[in-house]
Curated annotation (Swiss-Prot):
Pfam families given in the database record: Rotamase_3, SurA_N
InterPro entries in the record: OMP_Chaperone_SurA (IPR050280), PPIase_dom_sf (IPR046357), PPIase_PpiC (IPR000297), PPIase_SurA (IPR023034), SurA_N (IPR015391), Trigger_fact/SurA_dom_sf (IPR027304)
Role according to the record: Chaperone involved in the correct folding and assembly of outer membrane proteins. Recognizes specific patterns of aromatic residues and the orientation of their side chains, which are found more frequently in integral outer membrane proteins. May act in both early periplasmic and late outer membrane-associated steps of protein maturation.
Keywords: Chaperone, Isomerase, Periplasm, Repeat, Rotamase, Signal
This protein's name: Chaperone SurA
Compartments, as annotated in UniProt: Periplasm
Signal peptide bounds: 1-22
Source organism (scientific name): Vibrio cholerae serotype O1 (strain ATCC 39315 / El Tor Inaba N16961)
């Protein structure tokens, strides 16, 4: 069963694969210690069972048991580390946002709420378990997005240069469906060994070998458990090392091997199409930000904002006056809380959800992001089509997406390298 829409795969990829409690366990044990947390043997067994069942249903080959287990353990470790980061920085997913995400899942699977619940039960989950797992994965994704955003610096000159190039292009933009194999070269490892293997894999692939099977067996990349499938992307959405290699190759082309800082890469172009949408919705909103401190608790910040909303509704004070006096976002406070016309994608998920769903002129309930507690009011929405502003927004998104993918990969590697991880010997491995 496919629960997730394509655009949610990157946000919730581990959910159906690695979270299932279909059967009560009489005995359980710790499989991996990850910092102060643990991964249970039942989690590993459930993940392996689900992957094998899905592979059997889809008639997909799998690598040897030891290789598959290693990949599953590594994915569970990475997921756990991201969830720990979400807890550390205090990311919370409220019920309203969770409900919207679940509605979106049902919609994209062409299911009613009842049909989704039935499908979840077939996967071995109760509906409350499913909800909490979605909440957990959304929190981990939000933490990753927020922490990686802080590492990204985009200069105005970069945006202007790319916007000028985009203005010279035609409206149609080619999209590629690509698959990827990454052979990692660790410190002290002989690079020639990895290069020899990479050349052999390319030769085998060009002679008809199955790419997904090769990815399962050899890839150390982020999509190894999906057979290396990265899905549909425009070149500007790809990591730079991919985009630099793809010119105008045809469907079925094998590209590589080519080097990066982490090892050797092989790409396959599974399909090509040339469609692009250019309409952009921009939102002008204003907000008030209150940051919790040692003295001011979350509850205190929320209460203060609720009082602000009530005072505005009573006509005692204006939103602009309160923003100037109290908002702890210096940039917008000087503008009476106004953020100007921006595309919603530029904001963190909770803020984006509010400005996308609020009616114009309505003030939100207080809500929390990684920056603190907010209230927001949407002042206006407008559609922008091929203006200078739209081109610059598009250029910014392109640069952001490229740098985000690169920085996210580096962040995960740093997170993994700095973590205390101990994989405990499984009794099954000793038999």
């Amino acid at each position: 069963m496919k629960l997730w829409k394509p655009t949610l795969i990157s946000v919730l990829s581990a959910l159906t694969l690695f979270n299932a409690h279909a059967e009560p366990k009489q005995l359980d044990s710790v499989a991996v210690i990850v910092n102060s947390g643990v991964i249970l043997q039942s989690d590993v067994d459930s993940a392996l069972k689900t992957i094998k069942a899905n592979a059997k249903q889809n008639k997909q080959p799998l690598p040897q048991e030891t290789v598959l287990r290693e990949q599953v353990l590594e994915k569970l470790i990475i997921d756990t580390l991201q969830q720990q980061e979400a807890d550390r920085i205090g990311v919370k997913i409220d019920d309203n946002r969770l409900n919207e995400a679940i509605k979106e899942i049902a919609k994209n699977n062409q299911q009613t709420q009842e049909q989704l619940i039935a499908s979840v039960a077939q996967e071995g989950l109760t509906y409350p378990e499913f909800r909490e797992q979605v909440r957990k994965e959304m929190a981990a994704s939000d933490a990753r997005n927020a922490l990686v955003r802080r590492r990204i610096n985009i200069l105005p000159a970069e945006v202007d240069t790319l916007a000028e190039l985009l203005a010279q292009e035609t409206d149609a933009t080619v999209q590629y469906k690509i698959s990827h194999i990454q052979l990692r070269v660790d410190d002290g490892q002989d690079k020639s060994t990895a290069e020899t293997l990479a050349n052999k894999l390319v030769n085998d692939l060009r002679n008809g070998a199955d790419f997904a099977q090769m990815a399962y067996a050899y890839s150390k990349g982020p999509k190894a458990l999906q057979g290396g499938d990265w899905g549909w992307m425009r070149k500007e959405e790809m990591p730079t090392i991919f985009a630099d290699q793809i010119k105008m190759q045809n469907k079925g082309s094998i590209i590589g091997p080519f080097r990066s800082g982490v090892g050797f890469h092989i790409l396959k172009i599974d399909d090509v199409k040339g469609l692009e949408t250019v309409a952009v919705t921009e939102v002008n909103a204003r907000h008030i930000l209150i940051k919790p401190t040692i003295i001011l608790s979350d509850e205190g910040a929320q209460k203060q904002l609720n009082e602000f909303v009530q005072r505005i509704k009573n006509g005692e004070v204006t939103f602009a006056e309160l923003a100037q006096q109290y908002s702890q976002d210096p940039g917008s406070a000087a503008q009476k809380g106004e953020l100007g016309y921006q595309t919603p994608d530029l904001y963190v998920p909770e803020f984006k959800h509010q400005i996308e769903t609020l009616p114009v002129g309505q003030i939100s309930e207080p809500f929390k992001t990684v920056h603190g507690w907010h209230i927001v009011e949407v002042l206006d929405r407008r559609e922008v089509d091929r203006t200078d502003s739209a081109l610059k927004n598009k250029a910014y998104r392109i640069l952001f997406n490229r740098k985000f993918n690169e920085e996210a990969s580096a962040w995960l590697q740093e997170l993994r390298a700095s973590a205390f991880v101990e994989v405990l010997k499984d009794e099954k491995d000793e038999q």
